[in-house]
């Protein structure tokens, strides 16, 4: 029984799904998808639970969420192992994911009060008040790269605001989704407040097509996000929050410390085996001898990166991709770029047959026409050389995406220029593109999405503002508008 609907674990009525470790092939989880009727059942449960949950005091909702935080802490080692085994990422990285889940809960609680709490301003004849109200029943679609942390960034603020939820994890990480749901169960959420439906495309389509849905919160690929946007078009009554991918540029203008810049680039491009939406996909490198030296060093250090299993010792920097198919897609993308005229500096290769272990790839595309503006979700970095900083900014903005952008330069003036001209939601200076602060907005523009699903800013789309003018008494004004006559004369 792998679905959680209205406070009960039930067996899915859809197709059988089997999840294997992407490196070892070990069977980790199996269960049946939710069919359309079960998705509808989950929605009815969420709708029935909504009025009572929304009317609870914020403190009562906060108690359940903080209890969940405590359970994350006490079950950290177990959840770390589940996430690592299911995604293929190293143990150290899965541990940081669980830590981020814990830390963002306190920030989400504070954000509710600061961004969506209640405010009152006194007026001469009364007061103006601002309150926030939950949307109702929300669907949350989770991604596979951070199957605990990123859905958590939607679920926690939504629950705190008073919404009820139907959560569909990625079909590639059902075990992590179930493990997190079991902790919510222990936290004492009332039946129907949070429901879990497992499944792939058919389950997702049934969920997003529900009429009695007040909104959908999504983190994942641009292709799926676009499909959801089309599906919900013409329905302005439903909140749609999309956090999608990016074709992110990293500009290397001047390098004082080559090794430091190489480390920043590797952290930007290859951490999580390149499976972060903020990963650098395009390296825009200044032409000249210094750029040549940097590039040679980048290749030399990158070719030493050896992917390994989640529990290898010593721990590897990168593990496997989410699946063998995902690894092969990266290799295919590299082969296509090479066929277009790209110059391979470091060829990505499958480290072991029938696994998702893939070494990083670097390919130079300077002067190659028609390079697709697509996100290759893996450890593949494309390089362009540029002569001026203005040219680098133009190249950086030459994308339909707008998630993250970074600059390595000793000149603050160039960063100030980039801040004015960059089309990206995250713009960093001498910091990896993949770094993020829980108190800062996380998200982008264009094909990268709309709202900002972080602990602090997620509060904005989990509740809507209600404005009120209020007075303790009602008396006739001494001065009336022209044309109004309240005299006693007939």
Curated annotation (Swiss-Prot):
Gene Ontology BP, a term: arginine catabolic process to glutamate
Pfam families: Aldedh
Catalytic activity: N-succinyl-L-glutamate 5-semialdehyde + NAD(+) + H2O = N-succinyl-L-glutamate + NADH + 2 H(+)
Gene3D superfamilies xref list: Aldehyde Dehydrogenase, Chain A, domain 1, Aldehyde Dehydrogenase, Chain A, domain 2
Keywords: Arginine metabolism, NAD, Oxidoreductase
Its EC number(s): 1.2.1.71
Active site: 243, 277
Binding site for NAD(+): 220-225
Family per record: Belongs to the aldehyde dehydrogenase family. AstD subfamily.
Main function: Catalyzes the NAD-dependent reduction of succinylglutamate semialdehyde into succinylglutamate.
HAMAP family membership: Aldedh_AstD (MF_01174)
PANTHER family the UniProt entry points to: ALDEHYDE DEHYDROGENASE-RELATED
Name used for this protein in its record: N-succinylglutamate 5-semialdehyde dehydrogenase
Species this chain originates from: Shigella dysenteriae serotype 1 (strain Sd197)
Biological classification of the source: Bacteria, Pseudomonadati, Pseudomonadota, Gammaproteobacteria, Enterobacterales
């Amino acid at each position: 029984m792998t679905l959680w609907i209205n406070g009960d674990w039930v067996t899915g009525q859809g197709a059988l799904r089997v999840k294997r470790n992407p490196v070892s092939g070990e069977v980790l989880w199996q269960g049946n998808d939710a069919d359309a009727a079960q998705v509808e059942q989950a929605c009815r449960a969420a709708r029935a639970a909504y009025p009572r949950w929304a009317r609870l005091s914020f403190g009562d909702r906060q108690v359940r969420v903080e209890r969940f935080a405590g359970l994350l802490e006490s079950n950290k080692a177990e959840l770390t192992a589940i996430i690592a085994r299911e995604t293929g990422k190293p143990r150290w990285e899965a541990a940081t994911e669980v830590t981020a889940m814990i830390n963002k809960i306190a920030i989400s609680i504070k954000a509710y009060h600061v961004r969506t709490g209640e405010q009152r301003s006194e007026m001469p004849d009364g007061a103006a008040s601002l309150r926030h109200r939950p949307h109702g029943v929300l669907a949350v679609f989770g991604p596979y790269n951070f199957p605990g942390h990123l859905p958590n960034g939607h679920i926690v603020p939504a629950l705190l605001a008073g919404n009820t939820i139907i959560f569909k994890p990625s079909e590639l990480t059902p075990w992590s989704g179930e493990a997190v749901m079991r902790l919510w169960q222990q936290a004492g959420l009332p039946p129907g407040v949070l429901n879990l439906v497992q499944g792939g495309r058919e389950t997702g389509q049934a969920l997003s097509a529900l009429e009695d849905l007040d909104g959908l919160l999504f983190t994942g690929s641009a292709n799926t996000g676009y499909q959801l946007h089309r599906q919900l078009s013409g329905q302005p009554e439903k909140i749609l929050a999309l956090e999608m991918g990016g074709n992110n540029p990293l500009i290397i203008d001047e390098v004082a410390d080559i090794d430091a810049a190489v480390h920043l680039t590797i952290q930007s491009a290859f951490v999580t085996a390149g499976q972060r939406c903020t990963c650098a996909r395009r390296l825009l490198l200044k032409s000249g001898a210094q750029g040549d030296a940097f590039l040679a060093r980048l290749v030399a250090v990158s070719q030493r990166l050896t992917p390994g299993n989640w529990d290898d010792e010593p721990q590897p920097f990168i593990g496997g991709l989410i699946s063998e198919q995902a690894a092969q897609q990266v290799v295919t993308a590299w082969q296509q770029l090479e066929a277009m005229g790209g110059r391979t500096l470091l060829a990505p290769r499958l480290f072991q047959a029938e696994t998702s272990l893939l070494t990083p790839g670097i390919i130079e595309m300077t002067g190659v026409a028609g390079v697709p503006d697509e996100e290759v979700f893996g450890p593949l970095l494309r390089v362009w050389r540029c002569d001026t900083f203005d040219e680098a900014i133009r190249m950086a903005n030459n994308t339909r995406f707008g998630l993250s952008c970074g600059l390595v330069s000793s000149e603050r003036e160039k960063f100030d220029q980039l801040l004015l001209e960059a089309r990206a939601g995250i713009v960093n200076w001498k910091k990896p593109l993949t770094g993020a602060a829980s108190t800062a907005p996380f998200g982008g523009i264009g094909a990268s999405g709309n709202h900002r699903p972080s602990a602090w800013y997620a509060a904005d789309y989990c509740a809507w503002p209600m404005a009120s003018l209020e007075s303790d008494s009602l008396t006739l004004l001494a001065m009336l508008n022209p044309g109004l006559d309240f005299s006693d004369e007939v």
